[in-house]
């Protein structure tokens, strides 16, 4: 696991929040999540304000890989929650979750 030094000399995992707001960047955001997970970085993927538009077999397989690697997938769009297995997140919940991230990557 990827660990960094904490403020008091303790160790903790590195956590990244990948925020995908641009529908044209959905695949790049997902690929970034996979790359981070392969480096043993905790990942929270957020797809905001739109439904996945590029859902094909490759995207579906990559989402399954994110799930296998214990990545977390969230969306505030009901279509993603109902059709693609994302967990629902409100904007206030999003704010709390990304506040715990060491790195925030926007798309």
Language model: regions and residue ranges:
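Histidine-anchored nucleotide/phosphate-binding helix
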Residues: 25-41, 45
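Glycine-rich, highly charged phosphate/nucleotide-binding loops
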Residues: 84-93
């Amino acid at each position: 696991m990827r660990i960094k030094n904490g403020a008091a000399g303790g160790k903790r995992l590195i956590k990244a929040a990948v925020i995908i707001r641009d529908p044209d960047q959905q695949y790049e955001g997902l690929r970034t999540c996979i790359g981070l997970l392969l480096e043993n970085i905790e990942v929270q993927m957020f797809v905001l304000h739109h439904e996945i538009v590029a859902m094909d077999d490759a995207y579906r397989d990559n989402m399954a890989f994110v799930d296998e690697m214990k990545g977390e997938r969230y969306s505030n769009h009901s279509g993603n929650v109902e059709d693609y297995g994302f967990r629902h997140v409100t904007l206030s919940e999003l704010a709390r979750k990304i506040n715990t991230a060491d790195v925030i990557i926007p798309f």
